[in-house]
Amino acid sequence: MSAIYNFCAGPAMLPAAVMKKAQQELLDWNGQGVSVMEISHRSKEFIALTEQAESDLRELMQIPANYHVLFMHGGGRGQFSAVVNNFLGEQGKALYLVSGQWSSAALAEAQKLAGEAQIDSLNIVEKHNGLNAVVLPDLHKIDADYRYVHYCPNETVDGIEIFDELDSPWPIVADLSSTIMSREIDVSRYGLIYAGAQKNIGPSGLSIVIVRDDMLKLPSLPQSSIMDYRLAVEHDSMFNTPPTFAWYLAAEVFAWLKSTGGISSIAKINQQKAQMLYQCIDGNAFYRNGVVAANRSQMNVTFQLVNEALDGEFLKQAQIAGLVALKGHRIVGGMRASLYNAMPLDGIVALVKFMNEFAAKHS
């Protein structure tokens, strides 16, 4: 069978080695004679798995000791509401930086739940010569007492990524769903990091939360117990039955990433993959990208065919060539190639070859 390269934005492809291992031990995990999907989440064997998963993630991301690592339900959208309910209180204030679709969605959820609390927002994307560009504000010049400032460093729909570290006088809450472990960051700069698992961690249904200890002292709002960070910490992410199979696969992905050299190693590969694809787009008048070079996403490369009438044929021929899930988000259209950690360099080589051949044929 010819290789299939899955460019889906999420749920995304998983490392081939992880998938093969999961396949091999699906019916008999760890010598238990049953699947990991069937074993008790409170068994000593599964507890050992969760402890190893947290240890590996802490090592990979260099997470300081004063941070808790939580494995929770609900994905990224679940965390939109959890952040508000856990930190805002009845009279709190929060600032949301808007750079695209997902930060806009987080803002909308905060506004819906805030009640008497105050939610402010700043649009940080401007047009520079017709291209989208991020302009980070000087937050130290804002006279306000915010509980936190929320932002999304990578917008998967818009193909926008913020590489500069945010400098804030208030705790930073970051949605890292699409960039977690794709490049190195300084975790100590953040009050809370959350990430839906279905891009760089594992299957959908799981979210990772990395929260600094002092954030748990902020006033909270009434909320569902399963989204209460304090309860999650108290019960080691097992206040209720967790998504065990997703947790198992996340543990395997962490182990795989360590075996490949860790985040510093994968970051170099990710940069190389993105550069190859953007060079193809920029070097051919057949394609275009709408983001300034400094803010082009390494994880989600968006592009359009200058002749949009060829979109359908492009996707059809790409599918035949084994290049799947290249259709852009329904909101913005065009094309999108998601280059998460599991996407091998060979996938980009194949995509660039196809794009060049398609352009030559239809120019």
Swiss-Prot record:
Transferase in keyword set: yes
Q: Which cofactor does it need?
A: pyridoxal 5'-phosphate
**Enzyme class at the top of the EC tree:** transferase
Q: Where in the cell is it found?
A: Cytoplasm
Q: What is its main location?
A: cytoplasm
Q: Which reaction does it catalyse?
A: O-phospho-L-serine + 2-oxoglutarate = 3-phosphooxypyruvate + L-glutamate; 4-(phosphooxy)-L-threonine + 2-oxoglutarate = (R)-3-hydroxy-2-oxo-4-phosphooxybutanoate + L-glutamate
A GO molecular-function annotation: O-phospho-L-serine:2-oxoglutarate aminotransferase activity
Q: What pathway is this protein said to act in by its record?
A: Amino-acid biosynthesis; L-serine biosynthesis; L-serine from 3-phospho-D-glycerate: step 2/3; Cofactor biosynthesis; pyridoxine 5'-phosphate biosynthesis; pyridoxine 5'-phosphate from D-erythrose 4-phosphate: step 3/5
Q: Which residues carry this modification: N6-(pyridoxal phosphate)lysine?
A: 199
* Pfam families in alphabetical order: Aminotran_5 (PF00266)
Q: What does this protein do?
A: Catalyzes the reversible conversion of 3-phosphohydroxypyruvate to phosphoserine and of 3-hydroxy-2-oxo-4-phosphonooxybutanoate to phosphohydroxythreonine.
Which HAMAP family has this protein been placed in? SerC_aminotrans_5 (MF_00160)
UniProt name for this protein: Phosphoserine aminotransferase
